[in-house]
Amino acid sequence: MNILTNAEKRTYGAIVIGSGMAGGWAAKEFCDKGIKTLVLERGRKVTHNEDYPTTLLSPWEMEHRGQLTKQEIDENPTVSKCYAFREDAKHFFVKDAEHPYIQDKPFDWIRGYQTGGKSLLWARQTQRWSQLDFDGPARDGFAVPWPITYKEIDPWYSYVEHFAGISGNKDGLDSLPDGDFLPPMELTCVEKYFQKEMKRLYADRHVIIGRCAHLTEPRDIHIQQGRGTCLGRNLCQRGCPYGGYFSANSSTL
């Protein structure tokens, strides 16, 4: 344990609890504004690139070819529901037996206790809310009305999208607003055919490419973070050595 005895060195303008998606961004904002910031994380340290032990492994290089054993599934009935909880990424997840919790109602709590938290494991889909969503409580007569409007949060969406790097197509849909996008991922030939047929048969139904936090054409702001183009490996949950997707480890921290 490193204990600082100098009062000046252990005095901070801001303390952030947790180093995941929200904590990493909060720390970035404080530091960008010149505030000396301390980030506290309950889990182990995971350094970008250095601590992604399976990122370049092939299935045959893993004992169970990337799959879980029956014992692991039985011992982790909750976390094993997550698509990314497999042999190649299980070290980034909290195991059920090690951190049990009380469920008054069914709730699958998927957790990751390490630097970066679940920003290493998220599915990276980043659709904006629209005014339709913000109007939901008033329109449908439930819950508490939102104290903000889409118009107010729109520039903040753009601020985050520009820094994080969100790819997507500008589809002009009121229900799914466009943003500050990098070029979109390309649809497969099957998806393009499906899109064409849906447009022919159902003019009011739109098939679009998802807006996701993957760098298709990195801008200077992403290159300055040390990040590169997404290679489409579909192994993101292992940690990306290229920084192709947004995480606290590859970006904000």
Task: Label the predicted regions.
Residues 31-53:
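Glycine-rich FAD pyrophosphate-binding loop
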Residues 52-68:
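Acidic, Ser/Thr-rich peripheral helices and adjacent loops at domain boundaries
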Residues 1-11:
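A short, basic/flexible loop-to-alpha-helix module at the beginning of a structural domain
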Residues 63-70, 75-93, 98-108, 113-114, ...:
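Conserved redox-cofactor binding core of oxidoreductases
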Residues 22, 44-45, 120, 126-127:
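Short, glycine-/Ser/Thr-/acidic-enriched flexible segments
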Residues 13-39:
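N-terminal Rossmann-like FAD-binding beta1-loop-alpha1 element of flavoenzymes
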